UniProtKB/Swiss-Prot annotation:
The keyword ATP-binding does not apply. Keywords: Cytoplasm, DNA damage, DNA recombination, DNA repair, DNA-binding, Endonuclease, Hydrolase, Magnesium, Metal-binding, Nuclease. CDD domains: RuvC (cd16962). It holds the Pfam family RuvC. The gene is ruvC. It comes from Ralstonia nicotianae (strain ATCC BAA-1114 / GMI1000) (Ralstonia solanacearum). This is Crossover junction endodeoxyribonuclease RuvC. The active site is at 7, 67, 139. InterPro entries: RNaseH-like_sf, RNaseH_sf, X-over_junc_endoDNase_Mg_BS, X-over_junc_endoDNase_RuvC. GO terms for molecular function: crossover junction DNA endonuclease activity; DNA binding; magnesium ion binding. The RuvA-RuvB-RuvC complex processes Holliday junction (HJ) DNA during genetic recombination and DNA repair. Endonuclease that resolves HJ intermediates. Cleaves cruciform DNA by making single-stranded nicks across the HJ at symmetrical positions within the homologous arms, yielding a 5'-phosphate and a 3'-hydroxyl group; requires a central core of homology in the junction. The consensus cleavage sequence is 5'-(A/T)TT(C/G)-3'. Cleavage occurs on the 3'-side of the TT dinucleotide at the point of strand exchange.
């Protein structure tokens, strides 16, 4: 299975492509899509959409995983990130890809084993897990991390999160990937 991971951002969007063969992960590509900070917002969003659409055409992934938006201290920044994320998701959907979403906590838990890991720890583990010769930038590393998260059972986490309302009605919830009462 080929997975395209995305770390969305208005200025810089990271991407990472990997393949899962059984339990083995194989690095394919990573990098960033940059929008011109001097351009108007619609032009910047189009740059992201076009860039992601091109990644889908070039790498032909089976699915995509993307980091969920967090609420920033600055509401304006959160809104801009949400718009960038929307443009990215539309680019992914241009290829009719299934899109899976993960929180930063889920990503860090899957990659480092600790949900409060810092960016350096994520980068270091991405290098180790994918046997990379060089260290990817933080945006590309986060994108590879969200792809790793999906490859390591993220589908199960996403399905369990989708069941949360039904479980809550029965007095149950999912905590740390486990069903608790």
């Amino acid at each position: 299975m080929r997975i395209l991971g995305i770390d969305p951002g208005l200025r810089t969007t990271g991407f990472g492509v990997l393949e899962r063969h059984g339990h083995q992960l194989v690095y394919v590509a990573s990098g960033t899509i940059k929008s011109d900070g001097n351009a108007d917002l619609p032009s910047r969003l189009k740059t992201l959409y076009d860039g992601v659409s091109e990644l889908v055409r070039t790498y032909r992934p089976d699915c995509a995983s993307i980091e969920k938006v967090f609420v920033n201290v600055n509401p304006q920044s959160t809104l801009l990130l949400g718009q960038a994320r929307g443009a990215v998701i539309c680019g992914l959907m241009s290829g009719n890809l299934p899109v899976f979403e993960y929180t930063a906590l889920q990503l860090k838990q899957a990659v480092v084993g600790y949900g409060r890991a810092n960016k350096d720890q994520v980068q270091d583990m991405v290098v180790r897990l994918l046997n990379l010769e060089g260290r990817p930038g933080t945006d590309a590393a986060d994108a590879l991390g969200v792809a790793i998260c999906h490859a390591h059972g993220g589908e199960t986490l996403a399905a369990m999160a989708g069941l949360a309302p039904q479980l809550a009605r029965k007095g149950l919830r999912v905590r740390r990937g486990r069903l608790v009462g």
